[in-house]
């Protein structure tokens, strides 16, 4: 009876929490072994109940097809439905709340396009699989089924979902990017609207060779993130980032893709690729090989006004062609010891041989009177050999500490020989030969740590880049002369980014420090005036939240834009007897401040950015040496420029038709010296895109895309309007193993943009008359399809781009 009474009293204490103790149980207080045993068991039950109050809460969110859903909002609630904390699912649909939450009772799961769910939290904290069903709305007798938006916001990124959308059938990553909002261009030549050329990543590895985009099948892509205001963990010169994430790899064995593309513009060219992989266990071996060959055509007209003691007008018409042969190869491996540790390395090489020739005529007027007529012929041979590039990486986790290390080495040599023959009606004829040899090499490494911290996480790391660019130029043109220059640069950087969640708000703070030592040498002698050392801090700040169905994000960054090595190259190239072209070793880096706002609601999204640039680098002209009649086209720092840019878009689905509409505008505030006064270059540039995907019978996809861009000012240039109409048919066979793509791009040949460069003494009008109408046929065969495990992120890619 005594034992039973002890059990009842102890059980009541457990149920009310009074039996919870933090000190070890003293069994001496019990009068019998039975009571001691019973008391110990009840103590352990109470201890387990106490631990349950501090458990982690986890779960996984999937759609009706059991596919993981990322970017889903998960809110932790008390019994009275008051808010405790919030989280977002990762790429695998998983969410987790750490220990120590305040008496949680429910989780509420919500995502645009899906029905919300509120679920009880089990004692273990493991909720398991949560299935979200598409939201349906009854309108009269019609049921409208909502779809998950293709584009959404995650933190400071605009995320476009590829998996499960029509973009899966686009073809390659190149084709996907042409359909991503804010991304302009094609075939590896991409830019982000208002932000210039982006750094592109695939699974966290920075893309060093843009041909990799054509090697990645669209069906293997999960989503694409566009970051228009990247933070401290990116190089201070990176103004936009595109991150491509693929689906998880599956299966072992040998796999590959064979791809052949024929392109007909004015001349024919071909792009052929073969990619192979062998996978067993955690080991993956891969090799990629490719060839690009054919002939390219270009034609343009240039009108140049030069104001000196004599007003010179030059009217130049030029037609040219280039034949290219490029081979490239890449081989490497990756090994996953387990889900927490992987290593890998690759080596790539290739060579490019290009032969070009051009013919032209030029009419020269002096003070409006005929002065001379020139006939010009030129040819050049450009060879790049070798193009060494190697990468080594380690990616792992030690407990909750994430580690990512990358090292890159690059070395290449370029040789360019030129011949120019000018025949004059009234002056001496000119015959110029030149030979330029440039060498570039780079060693870079990057180490990044990540760790959970307080209400979020912290990332910190360092980056080191050592680079050299040398140029030797020899010519028999007495006006220019020979040149021998070299640039050495060392960049050491450290950065930290902290992300925290406070209720419905996500806050990110970052800081990057860069020490750059720049040395410029001519004929082996260091030029002190042109050699610089920079020590800079680059802060960043971001804030994001979700109010009902509206996603909002705001960010600030401080960036820089360092001149490319070509911009710094003191070599002067001969164009014609009145015009030379060269770099400027005295250039300073730009200083850039940007504030950005982003928002998304259902299928609509918008973005706006204000940018202030100090010492912007732009084209300009100066008299060359003591000859005021000869002008040098070069680069220079201007005082300042301000930009305002906005972009809005929406996507819809009407039966088999999936249209997307995007509208953007860029406006700058810039005043320059022009002629005898000042000139404002403030005209905005507008953009309109109308993209259509139609799912035809027999699983055929038809894409019809239209774009129009207005005239306006960009830096000290005035650009004319342009437009294009593209159409594409895509059909896959044999369970997507074989596909055929037919494309017609720029059907009406209206995509050329004419530009006018405005300077104090020289105005250059360039009219691009190249035929851009292109027809393409692509055949692709894939066997044993699998996805890349290589996790190297790459280091020093921005230096490679500067080369």
Where are these regions (language model features)?
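Outer-membrane beta-barrel signature, preferentially recognizing the C-terminal barrel domain
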Residues: 486-489, 529-532, 560-614, 632-645, ...
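Surface-exposed extracellular loop regions of Gram-negative outer-membrane beta-barrel proteins
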Residues: 245-260, 299, 303, 327-331, ...
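Short, acidic, small-residue-rich periplasmic hinge/interaction motif at the N-terminus
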Residues: 25-49, 75-77, 108-114, 126-166, ...
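Short acidic/polar hinge/loop motifs at secondary-structure boundaries
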Residues: 98, 179, 205-231
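N-terminal periplasmic accessory domains that precede
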Residues: 125-131, 141, 173-176, 210-211, ...
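Outer-membrane beta-barrel translocator/receptor signature
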Residues: 235-242, 250-300, 324-327
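Face-selective signature of the C-terminal outer-membrane beta-barrel domain
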Residues: 328-353, 377-523, 546, 550-551, ...
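Outer membrane beta-barrel strand-and-loop segments of large Gram-negative receptors
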Residues: 442-446, 493, 588, 594, ...
């Amino acid at each position: 009876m005594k034992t039973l009474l002890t059990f009842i009293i102890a059980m009541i204490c457990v149920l009310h929490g009074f039996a919870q103790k933090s000190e070890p149980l003293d069994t001496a207080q019990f009068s019998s072994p039975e009571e001691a045993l019973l008391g110990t068991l009840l103590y352990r039950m109470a201890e387990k109940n106490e631990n349950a109050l501090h458990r982690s809460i986890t779960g996984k969110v999937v759609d009706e097809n059991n596919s993981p859903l990322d970017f889903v909002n998960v809110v932790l609630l008390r019994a009275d439905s008051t808010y405790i904390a919030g989280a977002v699912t990762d790429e695998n649909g998983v969410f987790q709340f750490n220990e120590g939450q305040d008496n949680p009772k429910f989780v509420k799961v919500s995502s645009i396009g899906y029905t919300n769910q509120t679920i009880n939290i089990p004692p273990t904290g493991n909720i398991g699989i949560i299935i979200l069903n598409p939201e349906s709305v009854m309108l009269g007798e019609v049921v409208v089924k909502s779809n998950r938006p293709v584009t959404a916001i995650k933190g400071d990124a605009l995320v476009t979902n590829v998996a499960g959308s029509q973009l899966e059938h686009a073809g390659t990553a190149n084709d996907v990017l042409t359909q991503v909002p804010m991304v302009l261009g094609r075939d590896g030549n991409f830019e982000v609207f208002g932000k210039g050329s982006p750094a592109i990543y695939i699974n966290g590895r920075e893309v060093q060779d843009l041909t990799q985009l054509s090697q990645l099948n669209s069906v293997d892509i999960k989503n694409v993130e566009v970051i228009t205001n990247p933070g401290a963990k990116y190089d201070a010169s990176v103004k936009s980032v595109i991150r491509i994430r693929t689906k998880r790899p599956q299966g072992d064995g040998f796999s590959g893709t064979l791809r052949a593309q024929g392109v007909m513009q004015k001349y024919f060219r071909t792009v052929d690729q073969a990619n192979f992989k062998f996978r067993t266990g955690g080991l993956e071996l891969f090799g990629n090989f490719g060839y690009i060959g054919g002939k390219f055509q270009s034609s343009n007209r240039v009108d140049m006004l030069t104001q000196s003691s004599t007003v010179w007008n030059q009217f130049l018409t030029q037609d040219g062609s280039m034949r290219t042969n490029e081979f490239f190869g890449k081989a490497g491996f990756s090994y996953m010891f387990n889900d927490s540790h992987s290593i890998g390395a690759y080596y790539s090489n290739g060579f490019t041989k290009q032969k070009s020739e051009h013919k032209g005529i030029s009419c020269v007027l002096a003070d409006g009177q005929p002065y001379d007529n020139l006939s010009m012929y030129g040819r050049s041979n450009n060879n790049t050999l070798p193009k060494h590039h190697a990468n080594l990486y380690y990616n792992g986790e030690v407990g909750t500490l994430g580690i990512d290390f990358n090292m890159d080495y690059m070395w290449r040599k370029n040789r360019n020989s030129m011949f120019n023959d000018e025949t004059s009606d009234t002056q001496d004829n000119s015959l110029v030969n030149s030979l330029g040899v440039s060498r570039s090499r780079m060693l870079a490494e990057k180490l990044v740590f990540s760790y959970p911290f307080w209400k979020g996480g912290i990332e910190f790391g360092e980056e080191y880049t050592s680079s050299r660019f040398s140029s030797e130029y020899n010519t028999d043109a007495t006006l220019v002369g020979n040149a021998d220059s070299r640039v050495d640069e060392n960049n050491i950087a450290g950065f930290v980014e902290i992300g925290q969640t406070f209720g419905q708000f996500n806050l990110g703070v970052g800081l990057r420090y860069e020490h750059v030592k720049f040395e410029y040498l001519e004929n082996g002698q260091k030029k002190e005036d042109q050699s610089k050392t920079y020590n800079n801090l680059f802060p960043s700040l971001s804030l994001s939240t979700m109010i009902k169905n509206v996603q909002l994000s705001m960010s600030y960054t401080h960036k820089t834009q360092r001149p490319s090595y070509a911009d710094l190259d003191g070599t002067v190239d001969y164009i014609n007897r009145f015009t030379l072209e060269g770099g400027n070793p005295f250039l300073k880096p730009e200083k850039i401040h940007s504030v950005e706002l982003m928002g998304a609601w259902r299928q609509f999204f918008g973005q706006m950015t204000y940018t202030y640039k100090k010492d912007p680098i732009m084209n300009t002209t100066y008299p060359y040496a003591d000859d005021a009649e000869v002008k040098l086209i070069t680069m220079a720092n201007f005082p300042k420029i301000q930009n305002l840019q906005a972009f809005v878009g929406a996507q819809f689905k009407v039966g088999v038709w999936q249209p997307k509409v995007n509208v953007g505008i860029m406006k700058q505030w810039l005043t320059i010296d022009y002629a005898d006064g000042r000139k404002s270059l403030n005209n905005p540039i507008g953009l309109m895109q109308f993209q259509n995907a139609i799912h035809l019978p027999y699983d055929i996809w038809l894409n019809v895309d239209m774009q129009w861009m207005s005239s306006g000012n960009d830096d000290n240039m005035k650009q004319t309007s342009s437009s294009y109409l593209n159409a594409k048919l895509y059909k896959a066979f044999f369970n997507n193993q074989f596909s055929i793509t037919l494309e017609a791009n720029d059907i009406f040949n209206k995509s050329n943009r004419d530009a006018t460069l405005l300077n104090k003494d020289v105005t250059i009008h360039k009219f691009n008359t190249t035929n851009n109408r292109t027809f393409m046929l692509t055949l692709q065969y894939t066997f044993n399809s699998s996805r890349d495990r290589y996790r190297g992120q790459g280091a020093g890619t921005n230096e490679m781009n500067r080369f």
